[in-house]
């Protein structure tokens, strides 16, 4: 089972996403269920190591969003066109 630490994003938009990526983080979103969608930021290197395992895409993951645990599954992943970098992940609540 994977547990990923996340923080709620304070800023949104292209400029804010670029600043996150330069700080070795990247944006993501959690949606689904009865709760409102939540924009989050994740540590790039930690998630990159986890996503190398095939179970990352098929199992239920635990996101610790500012201390609150949420069960999610990966819905979509956006990657850099030629660098081994993640740009964005969509999570759906499990």
Swiss-Prot record:
Domain of life: Bacteria
Transmembrane segments: none
Alphabetical keyword list: Ribonucleoprotein, Ribosomal protein, RNA-binding, rRNA-binding
MF term (GO), any: structural constituent of ribosome
Statement: the UniProt record of this protein carries the keyword Ribonucleoprotein: yes
GO biological process: translation
Role description: This is one of the proteins that binds to the 5S RNA in the ribosome where it forms part of the central protuberance.
Name this protein carries in UniProt: Large ribosomal subunit protein bL25
Taxon lineage: Bacteria, Pseudomonadati, Pseudomonadota, Gammaproteobacteria, Enterobacterales
